[in-house]
Amino acid sequence: MIASKFGIGQQVRHSLLGYLGVVVDIDPVYSLAEPSPDELAVNDELRAAPWYHVVMEDDNGLPIHTYLAEAQLSSEMREEHPEQPSMDELARTIRKQLQAPRLRN
């Protein structure tokens, strides 16, 4: 069983670039099409660890979807980010939906 370090709805930071993001989905292992060596320089050990679908904002404040290895992310300690309120709102919305899912008949 593979354990993930981060959860859905959790705010994280890109370890190298410092961008704030919100985890929206988790894959236990790398699950996109097998990359060519030119596309993604990732070793097999990294591919076997959890990968995260993370929504971040680009330099213009527009949301972008990223696919990142667990090793590329770090925990975000602050809950409020006045410079990026949309990321705070996204995280709150996801956590709220996970706590009280709507039933559909």
UniProtKB/Swiss-Prot annotation:
Domain of life according to the entry: Bacteria
Localization annotation: Cytoplasm
GO molecular function annotation: DNA binding
GO cellular component, one term: cytoplasm
Chief location: cytoplasm
Family: Belongs to the HspQ family.
HAMAP family, A to Z: HspQ
Protein name per UniProt: Heat shock protein HspQ
Organism: Escherichia fergusonii (strain ATCC 35469 / DSM 13698 / CCUG 18766 / IAM 14443 / JCM 21226 / LMG 7866 / NBRC 102419 / NCTC 12128 / CDC 0568-73)
Gene name as annotated: hspQ
